[in-house]
Amino acid sequence: MLPWLSNGPAMNFTYPKSFRSRKIAANGTVIHVRIGGMGPAVVLLHGYGETGDMWAPLAARLVQSRTVIAPDLRGMGLSAPVDEGFDKKNQAEDVAGVMDALNVPDGAVIAHDIGNMVAFAFAAQHPGRVTRLVMMDAPVPGVGPLG
């Protein structure tokens, strides 16, 4: 394990004190988002059953030179509970709405697990707003297991 990811025997998912938490009305729902830093924006999209808290160790590093935006995806974490709108194209519009509310025209997008689907939809729908796209723990469509 990388030393900056470890905080003794358990992971530390606490954001630095310089981050602020905000609820943003976007695309017909309310999205909870953590924001910190200054510089080029990076949007961090979490996986299924997780929240933006999963990004705290990475965010603590990125905030030194970037504006970090870590939302809780629609209906998860501290975002408003909802019963609909979970298709990835719609959630991509949630991300666009958050960026609009923060006056962020573009940025790098880093995603994990189900956040990859939202990130891919966002990049497809808003290609001019994505400066870089990083997708982690993502199966590649059309490529099966080796063997």
Describe every region a protein language model picked out.
Residues 1-41, 64-66, 104-105:
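Alpha/beta-hydrolase fold catalytic core
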Residues 44-45, 110-111, 134-137:
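Short beta-strand segments
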